[in-house]
């Protein structure tokens, strides 16, 4: 089966692909990328300062090769829907994903490693792996980098979830209303854990 990268598709053609073939979408390979993780930091001053740690390069091969992964993306750490619903819900239902044949669940956002780590600690996230895409390079390659000027966010990720098998995207749930002008109410309809779990369990 042929595969192709999303970066080679225009926004219109990517949307048409998902609309026309839906659940039978042809897999496409994610772009090779190196993420900048931060490990080993200790908390100081109530968790606002991190010291003693080091930078660690983590590649897409490390994260996705020979694994079945659910990854969800969101506009930003510490924001209302992301903090109150999406991230904690995925963490709470982590075992259900494992039972459905998933190896790992990842949360990715256009935030740096310090922010992602602090957010996970603040919400007491125990299971979901936090992936920092500080420069938005990976998010851009997924066709999901958008501008959110009304909130003063700058470039962030549009909200989505995806099922990735051995580095190939095999299912993609994108929230409606994709735009670059903040002309939306930050929809959260299809990138929730229940939608992905329903899809996974129907395939078992």
Name each region found by the language model:
Residues 2-204:
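Chalcogenol-based redox active-site neighborhoods
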């Amino acid at each position: 089966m042929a595969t192709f990268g999303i970066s080679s598709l225009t926004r219109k053609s990517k949307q048409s692909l998902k609309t026309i073939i839906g659940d039978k979408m042809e897999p496409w390979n994610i772009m090779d990328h190196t993420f900048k993780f931060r490990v080993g930091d200790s908390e100081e001053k109530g968790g606002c300062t991190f010291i003693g740690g080091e930078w660690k390069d983590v590649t897409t091969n490390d994260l996705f090769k020979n694994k079945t992964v659910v990854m969800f993306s969101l506009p930003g750490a510490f924001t209302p829907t992301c903090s109150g619903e999406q991230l904690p819900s995925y963490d709470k239902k982590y075992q259900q994903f494992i039972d459905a044949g998933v190896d790992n669940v990842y949360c990715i956002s256009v935030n740096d490693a310090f922010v992602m780590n602090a957010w996970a600690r603040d919400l007491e996230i125990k299971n979901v792996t936090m992936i920092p895409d500080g420069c938005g390079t990976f998010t851009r390659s997924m066709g999901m980098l958008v501008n959110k000027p009304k909130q003063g966010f700058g470039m962030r990720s549009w909200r989505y979830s995806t099922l990735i098998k051995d580095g190939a995207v095999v299912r993609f749930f994108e929230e409606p209303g994709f735009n670059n002008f903040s002309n939306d109410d930050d929809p959260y309809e299809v990138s929730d854990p229940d939608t992905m779990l329903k899809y996974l369990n129907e395939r078992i």
